């Protein structure tokens, strides 16, 4: 969006490491909720937040007469929808749509050569994103098969299913992606190897949380798509 229109951002690992946001006011720290007082002090014309996580703060601001916009980006289509909304809401913004279309070009393959991929977003407990998740939509877009597609079940996180040891043994992925394992990545992969005796070490890959599980930023999305395209 138009950088001159941006006056404040959350203080996250993404924004704190990006020089483009170095001079902007932080309205939150880490995973904490944004401060209504700090936001009001900036006198914004529009406050954009994540549907669900920021709902309470957005509701409070709306009651105080501040214009708000809640977005939910849990599928690729939702990202495209959000980009169209932002272009209409914020004047002098570059074409977000054109940038997004170049991040992760859609790829189509014949069913016979599509690679089956298991994504483990958590190791304890073991959780895997289903089709109705950001990760699932990326796999679809890149012509990859989600190894948990069609599996029933759920977890405490919407769009994810808990993977028991029995389920891990039953599915036959060709690639296993482990997201930001705590501790030693090598040990984590070694602990998973017995569940997939037909796979080699090179069939396991460590991926970042941002881009694959949480969209994060356009840069993190591009990196995740590039890594997935190499599978």
Label each residue range with its predicted role.
Residues 27-37, 152-166:
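Short helix-initiation/N-cap motifs at beta->coil->alpha
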Residues 77-98, 105-107, 171, 175-231:
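Structured C-terminal subdomain patch of bacterial secreted/periplasmic proteins
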Residues 12-15, 32, 46-47, 52-56, ...:
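Solvent-exposed loop/turn segments at secondary-structure junctions
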Residues 18, 58-85:
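Flexible loop/hinge segments that line or gate small-molecule binding clefts
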Residues 1-42, 46-51, 144-147:
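A short, structured surface patch at a secondary-structure boundary
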Residues 1, 92-145:
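Basic- and aromatic-lined ligand-binding clefts that recognize polyanionic substrates
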Residues 10, 135-159, 204-208:
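His/Asp/Glu-enriched short active-site or ligand-binding loop at hydrolase and phosphoryl-transfer sites
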Residues 35-49, 66, 162-181:
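Proline-aspartate-enriched helix->loop->beta-strand connector
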